[in-house]
Amino acid sequence: MLMLALLCALFSACATEALLPTEPAAPSPAQEPEAAPTPAPTPEPDADALCTMCRDGFFAAFAPDYSGHDYTSLGMLDMLGLIEKQPLYAELAADTHTIAQMCARTAAQDVKAMSSLIDRTSVTVTGKLDWRLIAAACTMLDEPDKAIAAHTDVSVTIEGKTLNVCVSLPDFDALFAPLASDVHYGAMSLYCYLNTTYDNNAQILDNDGSYELSDEYIATIIDPLPKRHIKDGWYGDRSKSTRRHMGTDIRAREWQDIPSCTAGEVVRIAYNDIAGNYVTVKDDYGFYYSYCHMVELTTFLSEGDRVEQGQLIGHVGNTGNSDAPHLHLSIIAPEYVYINPYPVLARVRYGK
């Protein structure tokens, strides 16, 4: 009975507790939305990246328009026809320079707009691009515009907050030195002829072919045909007054040996309608000596061979534009102009 009474009392207490009112639960605080993550700032490109961007922008836009030129491959055969095109060549040279400036300026401004690292830009265009070089390029190259664009150099530097862009248009060596010897020599002959005979306005020059040479340099030269008569025919009319004579002639019997005046490298062995069979040697000081009208093409030497002063390079002949056996000697200076060989040989032969 006692156990039953205890169970009843416990049940009554639990029921009473269940009937008691409960206090309302405190409301949960409202949950704030999570803040969006702050995006990381876009990193500024470094100086090298900016310079690369500027160069890429230049080359993407630089495309000089040479659609008005005709590939002629005239060489030295039709100089009057080439000179008639001088205004076109001068215009192409000026346009190319202007286009280079415009493309460099635009590329620099584009880079400036993309970076707070740059406040100012500076553009410089340099190069020896004139109508004579353009004439050689248009005459000897199928696509001179693409060649000029490909050999244009662009350097970009950053000094402080200034972007400096320097565009260097190609000179003769950049355009032609890497090419095959026939193209290189043809272009050089033409370019040097134009430099020697015409000014910037294609007016004929009164050029006596003088060039200052030191006694030390003269000592490196020998007379190729001692005791033979040397004719000073520099700058005389040739080919019915369509061109000037770029050298001096030395009379000699056919098959007489021709030694090299200087030590140097054989850069050209070939034939053309004016020079006939010829050999050209570039000496150790950058002068080119061409020996023309040889009786036959020299086969015992090859282009690229080294020859020493006095070494046999061929034999006197009467080939090409010649009416009697003789050696035509021409000399091209490192500045790409022909010089008169007569006073050079006179100093070698007579010491004055």
What are these regions (language model features)?
Residues 160, 284-286, 336:
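Glycine-centered tight beta-turn/hairpin loop motif at sheet-sheet or coil-to-beta transitions
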Residues 1-7:
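Sec-dependent N-terminal signal peptides
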Residues 21-225:
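Non-catalytic extracellular/periplasmic "stalk"
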Residues 279-282, 305-352:
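Conserved, short, structured surface segments that act as functional micro-motifs
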Residues 189-277, 309:
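Surface-exposed, glycine-biased beta-strand/turn segments
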Residues 245-246, 260-300, 325-330:
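Zn2+-dependent peptidoglycan hydrolase active-site motif and core
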Residues 12-13:
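C-terminal motif of bacterial Sec signal peptides marking the signal peptidase cleavage site
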Residues 233, 269-270, 294, 316-319:
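Residue-level recognition of beta-strand microenvironments
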